[in-house]
Amino acid sequence: MRLALYEPDIPQNTGALLRLAACFGIGVDLIEPTGFLLDDRRLKRAALDYADLVDITRHSSWAQFCAARDPDSRLIVMTTTGTTPLHRFDFAATDTILLGRESAGVPEAVHAAADARLVIPLQSGARSLNVALAGAIALFEALRQVGRLPGGLPAR
């Protein structure tokens, strides 16, 4: 299981997602360009010291990400225009969950490359969740389904 971030533009959300990945023990694919420098203090503040615990693979473009991707890994795009509710999808341990830009989601080429396009059901009138929250919900559900949730309690 991996988390892919498509051209993220808010460093605090990227930092929160890196921390999430560290806590769940999964790798992150960072598809550039980003809307910030990777040494941005806001990213570091949100990630704390967890970013050092994450296997981060940087890709200079969408094309480079596609070329480097494991061909056995399904690409699962989280989108407000998804056709399958998150909780009705059967995840596999090798899936890559892709989150789009906070400001614009992902372009049509990314939608076209997806093996599945999932949506998190929301109350009527609600447009979307913060990308870090959506990532946390999606990743938890995926790891729960495949039996890969960490077994330990948080350190005290």
Spell out what each predicted region is.
Residues 1-156:
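Post-transcriptional modification and biogenesis factors for structured RNAs
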